């Protein structure tokens, strides 16, 4: 019985030892596997954050590119619309001199020359109109508008309301609705 007791004890004892050995390696491997999973999860989170940052950067760059395209298209349109401005500004004094010549001429003297100047002026104004040049509205009695008129002086005048154009010294011009030269006028007090 002793042997049985010892044998059954020995068998029970012998069976417990391998089980403890089997559990021990699993217990040692579990922290290593958990650490590895944690490392992989952290690496995945970092890559996902990097991918999100790259996507945001891509979206911003695409929006910047679209804004650049729109801006360059607008600049191109502006250039086409107002590219002749410096040429037209240089031509306007010629128009002024022709108008002055007609204003100070006698209808009796040299009517053929006067008619030639008148025709030339009309052709020049017609050509300017084709390119979008229009005259600023500035007739006697027109309300003074500092956006398109330049006041050269103020005068007493009861014929027109206060702060109105009395006399036009030089016509103003618009190029496609942009002021390129204000009308020089006298204004009533």
From Swiss-Prot:
Record's keyword annotation contains Iron: no
CDD domains per the UniProt record, alphabetical: GrpE
Keyword vocabulary terms for this entry: Chaperone, Cytoplasm, Stress response
UniProt-listed Pfam families: GrpE
Ranges of biased composition (kind: Low complexity): 20-34
Record's keyword annotation contains Aminoacyl-tRNA synthetase: no
GO cellular component: cytosol
InterPro entries referenced in this protein's UniProt entry, alphabetically: GrpE, GrpE_coiled_coil, GrpE_head
Domain of life: Bacteria
Listed Basic residues bias regions: 1-12
Subunit structure: Homodimer.
Function: Participates actively in the response to hyperosmotic and heat shock by preventing the aggregation of stress-denatured proteins, in association with DnaK and GrpE. It is the nucleotide exchange factor for DnaK and may function as a thermosensor. Unfolded proteins bind initially to DnaJ; upon interaction with the DnaJ-bound protein, DnaK hydrolyzes its bound ATP, resulting in the formation of a stable complex. GrpE releases ADP from DnaK; ATP binding to DnaK triggers the release of the substrate protein, thus completing the reaction cycle.
Family: Belongs to the GrpE family.
Protein name as annotated: Protein GrpE
Upper classification of the organism: Bacteria, Pseudomonadati, Thermodesulfobacteriota, Desulfuromonadia, Geobacterales
């Amino acid at each position: 019985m002793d042997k049985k007791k010892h044998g059954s004890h020995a068998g029970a004892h012998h069976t417990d030892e391998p089980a403890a050995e089997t559990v021990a390696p699993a217990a040692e491997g579990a922290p290593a596997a958990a650490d590895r999973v944690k490392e992989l999860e952290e690496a995945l989170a970092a890559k996902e954050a990097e991918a999100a940052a790259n996507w945001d950067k891509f979206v911003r760059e695409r929006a910047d590119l679209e804004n650049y395209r729109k801006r360059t298209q607008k600049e191109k349109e502006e250039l086409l619309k107002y590219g002749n401005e410096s040429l037209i500004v240089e031509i306007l004094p010629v128009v002024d001199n022709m108008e002055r010549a007609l204003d100070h001429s006698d209808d009796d003297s040299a009517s053929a020359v006067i008619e030639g100047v008148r025709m030339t002026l009309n052709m020049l104004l017609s050509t300017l109109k084709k390119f979008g040049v229009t005259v600023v509205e500035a007739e006697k009695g027109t309300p003074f508008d500092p956006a398109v008129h330049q006041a050269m002086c103020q005068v007493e005048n009861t014929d027109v309301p206060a702060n109105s154009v009395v006399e036009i010294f030089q016509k103003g011009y618009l190029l496609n609705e942009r002021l390129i030269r204000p009308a020089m006028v006298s204004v009533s007090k």
